[in-house]
């Protein structure tokens, strides 16, 4: 499938709203479900998705509550709620077991889904996720609160983050167009409510990893600006999940976009070992 073509959007109706997704519909091994980070869309995987499908995998990408082509206003935007959406999507598609991958905020969602429904999850992948972070101190909480307020009231700040921080190395050829789309999406009526729901949620829950029994892979960009010491965070997550760890040299917070080939190689090796 040509990665430059937009996949066909399908929808799952749930209590409270509608979730958008796409599905290649065929492939070898357990299907792979890719979840974007907060305030993003499933197009975050536009460069990784074709590499996985070219390798023969069935790939499903899903928009989160409030963003992409999903319904905008929900009563809950938490990682746990998103975990429930993923499991509902598996039911909807008649999938018994899948590999779940989550970036950033939704790393917690795939961990929660694996703990809640171990029989449904063949493996999990954390892509620069916030799971099992060291709890922030008082000053850090103040800084995070200020940043959250900026995101809610100033979509341009989200654009600044993507243009100046999130991609410390190479940027995708379509980067500027993509970032402009992210900023425009935040200005859609109702998105302020959705943004507030995400920035006030617990994106880094601790303790959830204890319930995970499936194989896990931790992928981390070596230059992720969201973490002072990215490899230390990856080590903590890998230890909590008894997981394989892969550092993507030079990658930022979105390795599937700035280093898609290296990210695909890490995922495909993990998937091969699950067979």
Indicate where each model-derived feature is located:
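Alpha/beta-hydrolase fold catalytic core
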Residues: 1-32, 54-57, 95-96, 122, ...
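Conserved HGGG/HGGXW glycine-rich cap/lid loop of the alpha/beta-hydrolase fold
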Residues: 24-69
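Active-site loop/oxyanion-hole signature of alpha/beta-hydrolase fold enzymes
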Residues: 46, 54, 61-101, 105
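Hydrolases whose catalytic domains are alpha/beta-hydrolase-1, hotdog thioesterase
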Residues: 109-113
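Flexible "cap/lid" loop of the alpha/beta hydrolase fold
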Residues: 115, 122-152
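Conserved alpha/beta-hydrolase catalytic His-Asp/Glu region
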Residues: 135-137, 153-211
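Conserved loop-alpha-helix segment in the C-terminal half of the alpha/beta-hydrolase fold
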Residues: 217-251
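Catalytic active-site module of serine/aspartate enzymes centered on a nucleophile-bearing elbow/loop
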Residues: 241-275
């Amino acid at each position: 499938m040509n990665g430059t073509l937009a996949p066909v959007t399908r929808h799952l109706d749930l209590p409270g709203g509608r979730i958008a997704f796409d599905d290649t519909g065929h492939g070898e091994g357990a299907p792979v479900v890719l979840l974007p980070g907060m305030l993003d869309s499933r197009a975050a995987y536009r460069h990784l998705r074709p590499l996985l499908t070219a390798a023969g995998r069935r790939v499903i990408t899903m928009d989160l509550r409030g963003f992409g082509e999903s319904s905008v206003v929900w009563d809950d935007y938490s990682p746990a709620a998103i975990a429930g959406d993923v499991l509902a999507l598996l039911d909807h598609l008649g999938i018994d077991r899948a590999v779940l991958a989550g970036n950033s905020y939704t790393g917690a969602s795939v961990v929660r889904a694996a703990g809640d429904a171990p029989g449904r999850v063949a493996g999990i992948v954390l892509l620069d996720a916030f799971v099992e972070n060291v709890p922030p101190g008082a000053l850090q909480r103040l800084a995070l609160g200020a940043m959250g307020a900026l995101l809610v009231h100033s979509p341009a700040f989200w654009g600044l983050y993507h243009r100046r921080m999130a991609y410390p190395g190479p940027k995708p050829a379509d980067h500027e167009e993509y970032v402009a789309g992210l900023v425009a999406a935040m200005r859609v009526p109702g998105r302020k409510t959705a943004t507030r729901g995400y920035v006030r949620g617990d994106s880094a829950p601790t303790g959830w990893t204890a319930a995970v029994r499936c194989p896990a892979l931790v992928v981390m960009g070596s230059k992720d600006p969201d973490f002072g010491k990215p490899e230390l965070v990856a080590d903590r997550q890998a230890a909590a999940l008894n997981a394989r760890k892969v550092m993507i040299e030079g990658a930022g917070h979105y390795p599937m976009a700035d280093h898609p080939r290296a990210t695909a190689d890490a995922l495909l090796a993990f998937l091969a070992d699950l067979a």
